[in-house]
Regions:
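Solvent-exposed loop/linker segments at secondary-structure transitions
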Residues: 160, 180, 192, 217
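Short, well-ordered beta-strand elements
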Residues: 173, 182-200
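Short, gly/Ser/Thr-rich active-site loops of penicillin-recognizing serine hydrolases
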Residues: 166, 198-226
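A short local loop/turn or secondary-structure capping micro-motif enriched for an aromatic residue
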Residues: 108-109, 179-181, 202-205
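Short acidic, gly/pro-rich beta-turn/loop elements at beta-sheet edges
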Residues: 54, 170, 194, 205-206
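Short, surface-exposed loop or secondary-structure junction motifs
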Residues: 1-178
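Hydrophobic aliphatic residue packing
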Residues: 48-49, 195-196, 214
Length: 226
């Protein structure tokens, strides 16, 4: 939500009630029958975790995921706490002007609310790579990590895009919020990967170009298509 606008509750967002600015989240097809990008689906999962854990979502994620991985400069708190704002990048529009009022507030924390750094996001990537090998399972077991990286409908696993070849698979994801665009790509078996974050609308094109250059210079597998 833009700065200065009323912030809806999670239930209001799910039901599409004012002051939410999105349609209600509704089942469109039987689960598993087809794939569709769904921030609403992650919002349902956010409410589910709150209901089951009886904790605030940001605290649950800090204790269950961020802290065990070592992502000390990351949080799902929305809006960003005052004491952390001095270290946050200013978001910019595509025309080079700052986003009015600063960063938006995203009560849809699971889908859009993570504040992080490239280094912390790289720790997330490395944890997946190491967890898959059984070297570090701070959050997921080897079997759960393998399940996370299996494709279902389309080319998505559980939260990540899966690409590459059977010999050298990789996982990737982009991220776009108002004034922030980012990309990550990492190979499951070789330990290679990169995270590029930008603070401008349209920055994902730059992030993807930087990752392609890294892939080419360092000779990643499938570097022509990464």
């Amino acid at each position: 939500m833009p700065a200065g606008t009323p912030i809806p509750t999670l239930v209001q967002i799910l039901n599409g009630e004012q002051p939410a600015n999105t349609a209600p989240v509704r089942l469109e097809a039987p689960p598993g029958s087809r794939w569709k990008h769904s921030g609403g689906g992650y919002t349902v999962m956010q409410q589910l975790l709150i209901d089951v854990s009886h904790e605030q979502f940001a605290k649950f994620m800090r204790d269950a995921v961020l802290a065990p991985i070592g992502m000390a400069r990351s949080t799902y708190e929305q809006p960003l706490p005052v004491e952390l704002r001095a270290g946050a990048a200013t978001p910019y529009n595509a025309d080079g002007t700052p986003v009015a009022g600063g960063p938006h507030t995203y009560p849809e924390m699971a889908a859009a609310g993570l504040w992080t750094t490239p280094t912390d996001l790289a720790r997330y990537v490395i944890e997946i790579q190491r967890s898959l090998r059984g070297d570090a399972n701070h959050v997921l077991s080897v079997e759960m990590t393998k399940q996370m990286l299996l494709t279902g409908q389309g080319n998505y696993g559980l939260g990540l895009v899966i690409g590459g070849s059977p010999e050298n698979p990789y996982f990737s994801h982009g991220g776009i919020n108002a004034g922030f665009e980012n990309s990550l790509v990492a190979y499951q078996r070789t330990g290679q990967g990169a995270v590029v974050m930008t603070n401008t609308q349209g920055g994902q094109q730059l992030a993807d170009a930087v990752i392609r250059s890294i892939a080419s210079v360092y000779g990643w597998p499938n570097s022509s298509s990464s």
